[in-house]
Amino acid sequence: MMAVFGGKEQIFKMERFALGEFDRSVDGFYKNVQTFSFGVKKKRAITVKISADVPVDVAVANEKGSSVTYKQSIKEGTVGPVPTEDNREMGLIVGIYKGDKATVSVEVWMERP
């Protein structure tokens, strides 16, 4: 979705993905962390909306891989606004404790601060 006259611009959306499923191909055999990357524009702010059936942990990372913000135990809510500063790409990390399972939906949008 494109922003018109400086409004919100959706830059990423994923609905109802499974977290915590058994997976022999990953270390520890459980896919309890999911990462996503997305392009951003400099000097903007992003907001992440989370909806999950059980609480999950959420972090936003810059293009150097450093955590910019972190929120623990979110079931419904938002993280941000988080300034993009000079980044052109950022990432989202969603995690759950080993052995737990969650169905998660995320949406990320960008707007002028």
Segments from the language model and where they lie:
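Predominantly extracellular/luminal regions of secreted and cell-surface proteins
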Residues: 2-15
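Surface-exposed beta-strand/loop patches in noncatalytic accessory domains
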Residues: 14-19, 24-28, 51-81
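Non-catalytic, beta-strand-enriched accessory regions in extracellular/secretory proteins
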Residues: 19-45
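Exposed aromatic-hydrophobic patches
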Residues: 33-38, 77-85
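Hydrophobic beta-strand segments within beta-rich accessory/binding domains
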Residues: 36-52, 58, 90-96
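Residue-level signal for short segments within beta-strands and strand-turn junctions
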Residues: 39, 60-64, 110-112
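Short connector loops at helix/strand junctions that flank enzyme active sites
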Residues: 41-43, 53, 76, 87, ...
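Edge beta-strands of jelly-roll/beta-sandwich modules across compartments, strongly enriched
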Residues: 56-57, 98-111
